């Protein structure tokens, strides 16, 4: 008995250690946003865990011990600075090094005011904007960490009627009217098996492990984000870890992945991801007649030359292949195999962003290049033994090179932002398609190419009163290119915008925005030629939409918010297919190529009312009508949609 007690006494501490809760430390640094100098003796707390925090040392660094695993944001406060909340971070064995930027506030020199800010708003976009944090990305039901599937539950967002695709229809618009940015670099499409001339696809290229947060705009677009009529998804990626090397291997529902974060020396950090799908194995085991396969990769490096200069390099690549499973038998399989082509797509984006902090000024120089190669191939009875069986061979490419400069200046209550950009777009299409009927199986040959130089400029100013009750923003943008004479004239694409927000009380805020936005029609429409090699759509103009939004927010103790927002949109200069009289806004939510037909302008109008609680509960109602200019008749294109 005595020996048993000794053994138990020895085992007990070991078991207690084994069942003790696992905790981690959170390390980071607090710096001044303008001077880039460390902020000493600032208080940093973990939001949601009372009393859990630390103070920065003389170098601005902090370390918070014994934090339970989970998703948290941090809050920093210091005398003379505005209290700031960070994006959400995952606390785990690979918790990243967190850098917090604080902004001076002369009104707070004699006191420290801690005001949590879970509902961040932009002065430029006080309505029609939502920030997607890690909590939503990781826990959104049914989304599988796919951003396009997360936002489909938001008010004003409808999903493709083809339910397995990520085509976003925002406030009655088209899938081609959405724009994507990643750390300030434009990404033409974020999905595998993309529809050329639109956006969307069944699976996202972006690995959620690398995302810090996403800003989703459904209106009130910032002046430095061009070419959007319906929405902008603005990704912010994490930075690499300057302290240690961390790697993660994952087996998902459709792919295996490897990601990592670390540092290369003392000045450079890196982040990467590589994924390989095994969908083709699953589809073959299920007896499906098509076998999709994709590979994607992503990387980001950041080099800090000194306190005032940094260079970010970013890359995103996707490779897609869809083969046919000709071994599959049965009536349904044979029907699909009779018309489905094999698909090969390669897409990539490479970009570099140099940022210089110069006191009140921040200058950014961004250079990027994106590329898409889309190929479809089909033989009669899937017999490729002879070229006589060829029914379709399509190869189409799109590429765009962009150089953009931005400068931001802070002058007390004012923030000014101005910039300019140059771009060069190249589009080619080489197709062979067998025509039947009156053409008696003739092999049609279609070739076209397009080379466009474009330019743009923008300016915006934000103002906030000393008591933070009133915020105003005004901006303009102008774009042009060499496609035709009207598009060369910048003032034809003059895009003004105005927004305002007023705090009626501590709980109520009234906000609104109005603006005119322009977007270039898809290259597939601009480059369409007839049999004589003449461009048929030379009379096209930039597509245009006028949008106004008005919203009201009600806050309860800064932890609960209910908002209601109404919007009105009026489209004009919208291309219309003369083949089926369907506007471009109603197309682009399927595989293949859209837009390569003859077009003419039309007008579309939509009105709506949306209610948007901060919790994942929402309702939307909108109605859209299409006005055919020749007859004046109104044809419904989208009905009323209700979503809970």
Language-model segments: which ranges?
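Surface-exposed extracellular loop regions of Gram-negative outer-membrane beta-barrel proteins
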Residues: 191, 327-332, 428-435, 506-548, ...
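Predominantly transmembrane beta-strands of Gram-negative outer membrane beta-barrel pores used
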Residues: 179, 213-224, 230-238, 245-289, ...
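Periplasmic N-terminal accessory/gating domains of Gram-negative outer-membrane beta-barrel systems
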Residues: 88-90, 115, 119-221, 232-234, ...
């Amino acid at each position: 008995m005595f020996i048993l007690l000794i053994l138990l006494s020895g085992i007990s501490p070991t078991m207690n250690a084994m069942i003790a809760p696992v905790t981690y430390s959170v390390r980071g640094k607090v710096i001044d946003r303008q001077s880039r100098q460390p902020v000493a003796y600032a208080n940093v707390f973990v939001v949601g865990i009372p009393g859990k925090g630390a103070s920065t040392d003389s170098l601005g660094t902090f370390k918070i011990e014994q934090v339970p695993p989970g998703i948290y944001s941090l809050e920093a406060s210091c005398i003379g600075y505005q209290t700031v909340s960070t994006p959400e971070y995952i606390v785990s064995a690979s918790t990243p090094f967190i850098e917090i930027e604080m902004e001076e506030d002369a009104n707070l020199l004699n006191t420290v005011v801690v005001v949590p800010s879970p509902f961040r708003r932009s002065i430029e976009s006080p309505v029609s904007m939502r920030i997607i944090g890690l909590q939503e990305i990781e826990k959104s039901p049914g989304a599988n960490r796919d951003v396009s599937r997360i936002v489909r539950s938001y008010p004003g967002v409808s999903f493709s009627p083809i339910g397995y695709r990520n085509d976003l229809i925002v406030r009655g618009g088209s899938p081609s009217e959405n724009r994507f940015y990643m750390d300030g670099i434009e990404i033409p499409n974020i999905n595998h098996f993309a529809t050329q001339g639109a956006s969307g696809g069944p699976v996202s290229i972006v690995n959620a492990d690398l995302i810090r947060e996403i800003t989703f705009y459904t209106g009130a677009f910032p002046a430095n984000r061009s070419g959007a009529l319906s929405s902008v998804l603005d990704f912010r990626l994490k930075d690499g870890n300057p302290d240690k090397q961390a790697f993660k291997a994952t087996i998902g529902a459709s792919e295996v992945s490897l990601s990592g974060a670390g540092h290369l020396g003392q000045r450079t950090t890196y982040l990467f991801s590589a994924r390989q799908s095994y969908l083709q194995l699953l589809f073959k085991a299920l007896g499906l007649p098509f076998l999709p396969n994709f590979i994607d990769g992503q990387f980001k490096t950041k080099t800090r030359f000194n306190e005032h200069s940094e260079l970010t390099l970013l890359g995103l690549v996707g490779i897609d292949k869809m083969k046919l499973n000709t071994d599959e038998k049965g009536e349904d399989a044979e029907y699909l195999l009779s018309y489905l082509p094999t698909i090969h797509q390669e897409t990539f984006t490479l970009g570099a962003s140099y940022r210089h902090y110069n006191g009140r000024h921040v200058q950014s120089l961004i250079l990027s290049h994106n590329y898409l190669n889309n190929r479809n191939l089909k033989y009669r009875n899937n017999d490729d033994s002879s070229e006589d069986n060829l029914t379709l061979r399509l190869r189409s490419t799109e590429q765009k090179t962009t150089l953009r400069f931005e400068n931001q200046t802070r002058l007390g209550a004012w923030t000014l932002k101005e910039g300019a950009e140059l771009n060069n777009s190249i589009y080619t299409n080489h197709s062979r398609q067998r025509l039947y009927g009156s053409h008696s199986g003739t092999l049609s040959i279609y070739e076209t190419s397009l080379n466009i130089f474009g330019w743009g400029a923008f300016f915006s100013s934000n103002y906030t009163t000393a008591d933070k009750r009133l915020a105003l923003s005004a901006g303009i943008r102008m774009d042009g290119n060499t496609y035709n004479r009207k598009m060369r004239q910048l003032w034809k694409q003059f895009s003004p915008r105005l927004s305002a927000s007023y705090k009626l009380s501590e709980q109520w805020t009234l906000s609104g925005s109005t603006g005119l936005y322009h977007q270039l029609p898809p290259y597939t429409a601009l480059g369409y030629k007839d049999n004589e090699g003449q461009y048929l759509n030379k009379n096209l103009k930039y597509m245009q939409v006028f949008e106004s939004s008005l919203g009201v927010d009600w806050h309860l103790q800064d932890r609960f918010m209910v908002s209601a927002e109404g919007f009105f949109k009026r489209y004009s200069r919208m291309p219309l297919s003369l083949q089926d009289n369907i506007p471009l806004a109603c197309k682009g939510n399927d595989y293949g190529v859209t837009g390569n037909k003859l077009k003419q302008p039309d007008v579309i109008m939509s009105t709506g009312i949306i209610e948007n609680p901060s919790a994942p509960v929402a309702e939307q109602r909108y109605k859209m009508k299409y006005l055919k200019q020749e007859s004046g008749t109104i044809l419904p294109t989208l009905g009323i949609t209700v979503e809970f």
